[in-house]
Amino acid sequence: MNTFFKLGSLIQRTASQISSSFPKSRFFSDGESAVYHHARLFKKPLSTKLKFNLVNSVSLMGFVDRSIQVMNTGPDRFGVFTILRVKDPLNPNRSFRISLRMWDAMARTCIAHLKLNDHILVSGRLESYSKSSSDVYSGLNLDYQVKVAEVNYVAAPPSHVLDSQISKNPKTKTEDDIEESKKDEIYLWQVFFSNPYDWWDNRRNKKNPKQPDFKHKDTGEALWLCSDLPDWITRRLELFDQKNRFYDEEKTRRDRLSDYI
């Protein structure tokens, strides 16, 4: 009896000494060793088969920043577009905008149901397109859009995401409408300057003042010149016209030289 008691005490002391000889830092609270933990964190990513339906697939959550607009398309296709404003969940003051394009059945669903400031989750394929491709003096300039395949409403968005949409000093509807209209106009000018050759320039052949000075070739959106335009728009237009004049002069000079060759 005493022999077994002494042997048990010896085993307990030995086990205690062995366990105490290992630094506690080599193990985590869940019993996982530091070596295994490091290997698990930095292991090589798994391989997967190429799935073409998932190439450039994206899902974005944000707010409808513009009313749904119908695109000028052929009789066999129906397309609409809008702008999605995506906010950083950790910093509501940071956001970006991206164009959404919807076609056929999806386009009809969106134009029937989506409204300005709707909080939505869209899934689709990210596409790129070249801007100012007709401008020989600019380098490759890409922009991005999402060809939408699925749209879902987002229920009960977090309050910190909506804080910029809720004004502390309530405004009248008229003031809101004016502010929204100005914001849309400024954004349209930014779209224009990003790719001015996607717009018809009607400044020299307007039949009446109500006609727009610039009209988008696909979406039909319009811009008018007015006396209260911001200075930066006026300066950008002057540079745009100057560059076009220089291009026309260079083209004329090359054509004349070719006549003598």
UniProtKB/Swiss-Prot annotation:
InterPro entries membership: NA-bd_OB-fold, Primosome_PriB/ssb, ssDNA-bd
Localization: Mitochondrion
Residue ranges of the region described as PDF region: 189-238
Any GO molecular function: single-stranded DNA binding
Leader peptide range in chain numbering: none
Consequences of knocking out this gene: Severe leaf variegation, distortion and partial sterility.
Tissue: Expressed in root elongation zone and in gametophytic cells.
Alphabetic keyword roster: DNA-binding, Mitochondrion, Transit peptide
GO CC annotation: apoplast; mitochondrion
Organelle targeting sequence: 1-28
Domain SSB, chain residue ranges per copy: 55-155
GO terms (BP aspect): DNA replication; mitochondrial genome maintenance; negative regulation of DNA recombination
Function: Regulates mitochondrial DNA recombination. Represses homologous recombination, preventing mitochondrial genome instability and unbalanced transmission of alternative mtDNA configurations. Binds preferentially single-stranded DNA. Does not bind to RNA.
Domain remarks: The PDF region is required for protein-DNA interaction while the SSB domain is not required for ssDNA binding.
Name this polypeptide is given: Protein OSB1, mitochondrial
Organism: Arabidopsis thaliana
